[in-house]
Amino acid sequence: MNTRIEHIHKLGVDIGRVIISPVKDGKSDTAFLSGGIEQALQTPPAEGAIERLTRLVEVFEGRVWLVSKAGKNTQHKTRLWLAHHRFFERTGMSAHHLRFCFKRHEKAGHCVELGLTHFVDDRLDVLRHLQGLAPHLYLFGEQLKSQSAPDWVEPTLNWDETFTAICRSLD
């Protein structure tokens, strides 16, 4: 009898400031949150996000979910942005793998329900809620200099670093 248990890897990814770029033309871009729908749609994807997520969808055999904290208005803008940029078609990710919550700590419930093993977020306060739930946590993007990453997260500055770190964890 084979008693070996295969561990199925599953990835969760935040949207704002991770997939949707926080910077436009070298400046902080707040148009997605504070502007109208047309401005939000013009916000580009983060550099390398589409390409690297396309590969991660393949590596994780489709077990990739978007998990975002957003109010009703931002949820609507996010859905429109994903459609406008043909996100699901371009990455191969299932459009049914989109989850929203109203409070940051609620991402933990999605993490448990989906059995996520890896999670990428730009906020340390979110990742604190996932500590002990997903074994591989990635703090994405530039952080405040006064905020050093604890040893239970892996800081990654961009999608190239994130992709490399995630793939390394699968070896």
Where in this protein do the model-derived segments appear?
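Acidic-and-aromatic substrate-binding clefts and catalytic sites of carbohydrate-active enzymes
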Residues: 41-45, 72-74, 102
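Active-site neighborhood of HAD-like aspartate-dependent phosphohydrolases
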Residues: 1-47, 51-58
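Substrate-recognition element of Asp-dependent hydrolases with the DxDx(T/V) motif
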Residues: 49-82
